[in-house]
Amino acid sequence: FQPYFTATASNIGYGWWSHDIGGHMCGYRNEHLEARWYQLGTFSPINRLHSSSSPFTGKEPWNFSGDVHAAMVASLRLRHMLLPYLYTMNYRAALDGRPLVEPMYWSEPNNPQAYEVPDEFRFGTELLVAPIVTDDDPTAQRGRTEAWLPQGEWYDFFDGRRYVSDNASGRRLEVWRALDRTPVFAKAGGIIPLQELATGDDVNDLRNP
């Protein structure tokens, strides 16, 4: 329900929404879902890990190993790379009152398909995000979700794969992704400013926001 809450909070003017990434108390531990939650946090208004002194509730990436740790670190680094885009979209939010995250039906209120993907949302003006919120299929070793692409051309944010949605009602997709990827689509012609990851002496430099 976290992607749904994150998107629909905008309906009541609550654009600065966050969640306890990885959960907080109770529940059960699932490392792959922890990594998927990191990915949702990367494409949320506020990216906030929740933790405590207990190893069970500690959500920091150094509490994990292997492919889960790698996926978590990649998500945090991507969030840092997205800072110029986030700054631009938050300036837009302050100027125009448009939140960073919007349900799909905001831009196409008369399209019934826009209401059929409650976990999918627009992230700023250029990106669509369809988070994976279930465990990976044990056979395929991939996570699965359904996505809807409005009419037009779209590109996978990570590998540049092209998707064409040539119907006015849009295109529904069954999307499978490895643990280190989450379904994010950029519209054709979109501009997504990113910054390079700082290394060496530049990590704490004033030039590195």
Named regions from a protein language model:
Residues 206-209:
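A glycine-rich beta-turn/hairpin centered on an aromatic-Pro dipeptide
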Residues 1-188, 195, 199-203:
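Catalytic-domain carbohydrate-binding cleft regions of carbohydrate-active enzymes
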